[in-house]
Swiss-Prot record:
Name the UniProt record assigns to this protein: Putative ABC transporter ATP-binding protein YjkB
Keyword Oxidoreductase found: no
GO biological process, one term: phosphate ion transmembrane transport
Homology family: Belongs to the ABC transporter superfamily.
Ranges of residues in domain ABC transporter: 13-245
Keywords: ATP-binding, Nucleotide-binding, Transport
Organism: Bacillus subtilis (strain 168)
Ligand binding (ATP): 49-56
A single cellular component GO annotation: membrane
Amino acid sequence: MEANDQTQNIPAISFRSVRKSYKQDGQTYDVLQDVTGDIQQGAIVAVLGPSGSGKSTLLSMCNLMRTPDSGEVNIYGKEVREWNVNELRRTAALAFQSAPVLDGTVRDNLSLVQRLHQSQLYSPEKLASLAGLPPELLDRSARDLSGGQRQRLSLARTLSNPSSILLLDEITSALDPVSALEIEELIKRQHQEKKWTVMWVTHNMEQAKRIADTIWFMADGRLLEIAETDTFFSAPQHEAAKEFLKGGTR
């Protein structure tokens, strides 16, 4: 789905009183607590916060990798559980740090995803090039790739998707700084070209400064602060955000 006359003024992503908990060893752990916020169409939002703050869980709800216990997650104004799953995942594509690879070659992985998405936007060669995968890797077993190469493959698969929302979960965590910058530039170029909405979970504060126009700060399962990037880094409002910035909390 893309913006049209009916949807162009609707947030691309909205969360309304979202809660999620898990039970383990007889204990209940609140992962998300009453999260409410909107991401407008065309925005790049970086989601920051300490480990265990619920960032990845929140992101994964946008394409039904997980579901909330209560509350709503809406994509273009439609609750995610009302979507056809395949259509939803063609609209909101997820790339994450530990994405599994499929049996077969890198080319096979890319071609299969293209068939699933009914998309031939790019050839496997073009997708590999966009994601910074050397062409000689296309016919290598995907299971032989390094951690960083697997992250690039995950990104290439996401780029094959005719989506308008890009959900990124620590996609440069296994890359060296130069490679991470290359991926950032790729995302920014594609964002400008395709007018994507991007929700990017990262621990890297410098990366967030470079890529995002808006920061969402989370801690202990709560969305504590939403601010323009410059404002967040120069004048955070919440005490937990101040401590995070001061100590580089992870």
